[in-house]
Amino acid sequence: MILKRISILNYKNLEQVEIGFSAKLNCFFGQNGMGKTNLLDAVYFLSFCKSSGNPIDSQNIRHEQDFFVIQGFYEAEDGTPEEIYCGMKRRSKKQFKRNKKEYSRFSDHIGFLPLVMVSPADSELIAGGSDERRRFMDVVISQYDKEYLEALIRYNKALAQRNTLLKSEFPVEEELFLVWEEMMAQAGEIVFRKREAFIEEFIPIFQSFYSFISQDKEQVGLSYDSHARDASLLEVLKQSRERDKIMGFSLRGIHKDELNMLLGDFPIKKEGSQGQNKTYLVALKLAQFDFLKRTGQTVPLLLLDDIFDKLDASRVCLLYTSPS
């Protein structure tokens, strides 16, 4: 998919922007605060129906304005034109349209415009909690597997309902817990299997990119841990129920999965230098791009935001050639 042109009104600090793009490589230069990252974020919004940095849509409206609009004009590999529209007014629901037809569910759009973004915020994949690493898996898999996305949505809805019951000040029938636990188990098993299969296929691609950028200086890896690996997820949830009641939330399930990021045999969070961490993250995202290119129906868009900081000159030179 090629982004031919974008039109932006009142998005973050961008008052009015109209830009046409080259079909291959586009570079943006400017001082800090001019809106380069916000321009990339607007492109991201058109793929994921949300900002990469601020999930509260109304806060992405430019100060002292009442709305924002983002329109993207694309061209598919067969030459078919595609127009994506997003509009948001304060105190109103967000609208998302493809070729002037509004989506009834935003999830129906996910994967239509596959996209990978490399940015300074990626450092949270290493430094942050396990939720950041689960989100990485979710973002990749959801862009090529609708069954995964639907199962993840069902699981999260059931999880929210179970957590509500766990917080109840009044006695709750065990059968009611079982309803949501069965839904969590059914959807969670799908999520687990697909995460496991993804990681198995993804690891050699990631290692290849890291090896290329680092010139074989280090070995890296990924390992995936889940409560669903060694036992029935339904039994895990039932056995954890009494403890969960005390805590007021669900302690076990695929929402607690962990993706371990390794430098050699040790967590890169503890062992990696700034340069190694940056190389690891860039290789991870370039592998994501390559994986989606192989797996999906169209070539993803690749957004690179300030990626050369903390890399030595030799790795920067190698990185220039990697996307090609």
Describe these PLM feature segments.
Residues 1-31, 172-186, 190-303, 310-318:
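Conserved NTPase motor "head" modules and their coupling/switch loops across ABC/AAA+ ATPases, GTPases
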Residues 124-213:
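An accessory alpha-helical subdomain
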Residues 320-324:
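Conserved small/polar residues in nucleotide/adenosyl-binding loops
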